[in-house]
């Protein structure tokens, strides 16, 4: 059991049976008031950011998540099948854990998966992936005012790309911001 004074980025907490990852924390001192710790936390069940205040030296339950590297194989019904790259176990990941990241999954993509015991709580894609452009819209009605156009990637993701990108090009994409980085 740790205390609120020991909060550091990357630490995982259990609060009301929910897991949170500490993104940042700062000690706040107010005139004629009691100082406290203000933390930005990421809810691992839905990836939403929340702010929480803790009293100084307040006991907190820190937990250890196990990080495993998984390679995407294929979707299977409402779940996604991955292969643990270390022990070669197959792991079924529920759709709600993968939601929001599905459009970047293709066979062979390696992700980080975070487990608490045997339960998977979160997955994290690599920040950058190289994907093939399956289709681009080049007609004037689909062009955006900023000169970009919409491209549909091999995984089904839709992103804005510069006008010179064509079907069949391989591009580097930022999976966190859904942005085009460069042609490969």
Swiss-Prot record:
One of its GO terms (biological process) is peptide biosynthetic process. Pfam families: EFP, EFP_N, Elong-fact-P_C. It is found in: Cytoplasm. One of its GO terms (molecular function) is translation elongation factor activity. Pathway: Protein biosynthesis; polypeptide chain elongation. Its main location: cytoplasm. Keywords: Cytoplasm, Elongation factor, Protein biosynthesis. One of its GO terms (cellular component) is cytoplasm. SUPFAM superfamilies: Nucleic acid-binding proteins, Translation proteins SH3-like domain. Involved in peptide bond synthesis. Stimulates efficient translation and peptide-bond synthesis on native or reconstituted 70S ribosomes in vitro. Probably functions indirectly by altering the affinity of the ribosome for aminoacyl-tRNA, thus increasing their reactivity as acceptors for peptidyl transferase. Belongs to the elongation factor P family. NCBIfam families: PRK00529.1, PRK12426.1. This is Elongation factor P 1. It comes from Protochlamydia amoebophila (strain UWE25). The lineage of its organism: Bacteria, Pseudomonadati, Chlamydiota, Chlamydiia, Parachlamydiales. The gene is efp1.
């Amino acid at each position: 059991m740790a205390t609120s004074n020991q909060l550091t980025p990357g630490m995982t907490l259990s609060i009301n049976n929910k897991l949170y990852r500490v993104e940042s924390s700062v000690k706040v001192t107010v005139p004629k008031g009691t100082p406290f710790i203000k933390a930005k936390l990421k809810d691992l069940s839905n990836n939403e950011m929340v702010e929480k205040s803790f009293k100084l030296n307040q006991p907190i339950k820190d937990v250890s998540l196990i990080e495993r590297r998984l390679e995407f194989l294929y979707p299977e019904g409402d779940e996604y099948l991955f292969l643990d790259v270390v022990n070669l176990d197959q792991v079924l990941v529920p759709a709600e854990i993968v939601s929001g990241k599905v459009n970047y999954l293709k066979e062979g993509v390696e992700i980080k998966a975070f487990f608490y015991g045997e339960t998977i709580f979160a997955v994290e894609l690599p920040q950058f992936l190289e994907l093939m452009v399956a289709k681009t819209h080049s007609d004037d009605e689909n062009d955006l005012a900023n000169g970009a156009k919409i491209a549909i990637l091999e995984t089904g993701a839709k992103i804005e790309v510069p006008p010179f990108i064509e079907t069949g090009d391989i591009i580097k994409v930022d999976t966190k911001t859904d942005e085009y980085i460069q042609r490969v």
